[in-house]
Amino acid sequence: MTDSAEIASKITSLIGNDRVRTPRGIEPSAAVVIATPADAAEIAEIVHKCEADKIPIAAIGAARTLSEIRRTPVAIGISLERMARVAAYEPHDMTIVAQPGISIADLNAAMAPSGQRLPVDPRNPRASTVGALIAAHHAGPLRLSEGTARDLLIGIQYVGHGGQTIRSGGRVVKNVAGYDLMKLMNGSFGTLGIITEAAFKVRPAPGNYTLALAAPPTAAEAFAAACALCAAAPFAHLEVTSPRVSATLGLGSQFSLLAGFSGTRAEVDYLRETTARIIPDVQFLADADAMRTYCALRDFDFSATSLAAQIAVPPAELPQALDSCGTEFRAHAASGIAQVMTYDVLTAEAARSTILKWRGLVRNARGHVRVVHAAPEMRAALEFFDTPNNGAFELMRALKAAFDPAGIFNPGCFVGGI
């Protein structure tokens, strides 16, 4: 069903005319009609109706993820904009429970008076929601020291098949019931259900953030320096960027090493001394200058590229994998993860050939590739995810069939068209 008026009328009958609207901003690439339920009960009604009528749906926060990867818009986007508050916060227990539509920036602002934060740093946290953080497994440079949402999630609630509300885990760190279900929802891209609440463990917000910058002559020297730093001390993040990416960050057209660290004044002084001993020509930024450069690094915008993909390999294999790809990159040097990109004007077939080339090279390094940005006209020609071995793929298909037998949750947007 693609007729927007007919779709809208079906949802209006459930939640009212004021809760259904046309897409705006980047949403037209994600959905034909936008529904804005106020709570999990209204989402459950929509799911029940859409299963009966075979109408595909998908959760939408800022719509950024779906607008970047869907080949065609889903019939109904379930906007979580009305579900954007902190449900519970216990500073002494260091836990927080949030609705899926709240942005990471607003979530951390709520904890700032208590000196705490959710230590994940997806691109543009003002436009990155809790729901997308989990469903798309977003992460940034801090994954080196803090992990990802998968490591911090202690409880989850979502609406699934039949409009049922499913809960797993709890609101305290010691409660580990449902551990596997939380892992399953993480990175599922909304194909198993719609998240309505999430509980996280949080951590103290560190102070005195300092950024060390260096410009090694080659990528190999940049990665060697990052490896030496990683072995010497605990850094918050270690990034290596190619010349064009460095220029975008305001660092000049050169290979760049960006090493960030925080802590007490004594800890920061020690890390400065350690860094200077390993990289004699290093430059240090502090306070607003450090944060400005870090934010530019974290928020790097792939929309200026023609094609971008994320690769993940064993950390020791990353320098060679990037050299083989022969492209511009932003690399999380000690994590084995990087984004590779090209700025060349590509046809759909050229884009497909480029992704196949990257996949072959990365597979040789025992890794995998996921497309993170492609122009809409290219998407039909691309497989956004690697295809796993037959056993793993059959397991994924079985899980999809068990969790979403009607096939309405964000169909065709995951591995192998799941």
Question: Where are these predicted regions, by residue range?
Answer:
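FAD-binding subdomain of flavoenzyme oxidoreductases
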Residues: 113-121, 125-239
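Glycine-rich N-terminal segment of FAD-binding domains in flavoprotein oxidoreductases
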Residues: 24-89, 95-100, 105-120
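N-terminal accessory segments
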Residues: 1-30, 49-57, 62-64, 362-381, ...
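Short amphipathic alpha-helix segments
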Residues: 6-12, 219-241, 311-327, 351-362
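Conserved glycine-rich FAD pyrophosphate-binding loop
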Residues: 55, 70-75, 79-81, 108, ...
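Helix N-cap motif at beta-to-alpha junctions
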Residues: 40, 217-219, 261-268, 314-318, ...
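A generic structural motif
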Residues: 33, 250-262, 335-344
